[in-house]
Amino acid sequence: MDTSTLKIRLETARSSFQNLELQLADPDVASDPKRLETIARERARLEPLVLDYEKLLEIEEELLEVKDVLRESKSDKDLEELAQDEMRKLELFKTNLINQLTLALLPKDPRDERSVMLEIRAGAGGDEACIWAGDLARMYERYGQKIGWSVRPISSTDADLGGFRELIISVKGDSVFSQLKFEAGVHRVQRVPATESQGRVHTSTATVAVMPEADPVEVQLDPGDLEISTARSGGAGGQNVNKVETAVDLLHKPTGIRVFCTQERSQLQNRERAMEILRAKLLEMEIAEANAKERSARLAQVGTGDRSEKIRTYNYKDNRTTDHRLGINFPLENVLEGELDNLIGACIAEEQRLMIEELGEQSEN
């Protein structure tokens, strides 16, 4: 994005900010709590951007003054040197501020602030794929714990030799989707399985779907589209095990999506949880369909969010994790321990770079 385009957008933001301040002073707005909250929230969102823009304008004024000093100080070498030093500092500050403002103006995903449900499914590779699905679940659990998110399983189908055929994890916290959305896709592992007696390297896969939580208003469910049945599930222990029908089997007839919930202690809780999962799955389908239509070929390079996209290979022999979208390797052991900051940060940076490129081309046209 060139500087002139950036300034046009920043002037628009400043004008909107000033208009919002006038509205906040309006008695009619003050007497309408809902409208007041909406305007105050939008003003708070724009304020840091406007303050940084005003800083940029101040720096540009200072640069003009320093250039005047330089023109007038040809006969005074000490003053000229001081002015040149000051100009270098201001130019660096200006460059950093322009970069910061450019990032702040990039389109935001409205779902970035949400909590998510992670669905991990064993893919190709039989028992080893199920074990690998369990390893991925532990990786995300460790990452969430480091950040301070709440991470808990809400639905699972265990495998005979360990791991899971399918697992859904609830991850709650601030801006979870903004971090984990880059994890959607096929995760491939190359290693010697614990079940392998000949020491041969096997390749197995697991798929990860990242589903932002959907509220009942956003994704409405028609009761006529649902088929709900119950089953016996392990209770609190002792005499209750397999005697109380607390498990819920939910089928969404139009899509064929089936959700089986057993993790909660009561049938009502499992029913509510199954509804939450179904809404998240339907929202994921809607997002994937929109991305396929609207996401440009350039931005698709850093991921489409589709669960069938091959995004990463974990190679145990070489202690290497390769992200195929970035073409970058990361230490395997660190990644599996949940140290995903560098990897996810690289994905975010690449997406931002591609978005800036795209905005630049749009402004030229």
From Swiss-Prot:
Gene3D superfamilies: 3.30.160.20, 3.30.70.1660, 6.10.140.1950
Cytoplasm found in the keyword field: yes
Pfam families linked: PCRF, RF-1
Lineage: Bacteria, Bacillati, Cyanobacteriota, Cyanophyceae, Synechococcales
Family note: Belongs to the prokaryotic/mitochondrial release factor family.
Keywords on record: Cytoplasm, Methylation, Protein biosynthesis
Keyword RNA-binding: no
Gene: prfA
Xref: InterPro entries: PCRF, Pep_chain_release_fac_I, Pep_chain_release_fac_I_sf, Prokaryotic/Mito_RF, RF-1
Listed GO CC annotations: cytoplasm
Protein function: Peptide chain release factor 1 directs the termination of translation in response to the peptide chain termination codons UAG and UAA.
Free-text description of this protein's post-translational modifications in UniProt: Methylated by PrmC. Methylation increases the termination efficiency of RF1.
Transmembrane segments: none
Domain of life (superkingdom): Bacteria
GO molecular function: translation release factor activity, codon specific
Modification sites for N5-methylglutamine: Q239
UniProt protein name: Peptide chain release factor 1
Compartment(s): Cytoplasm
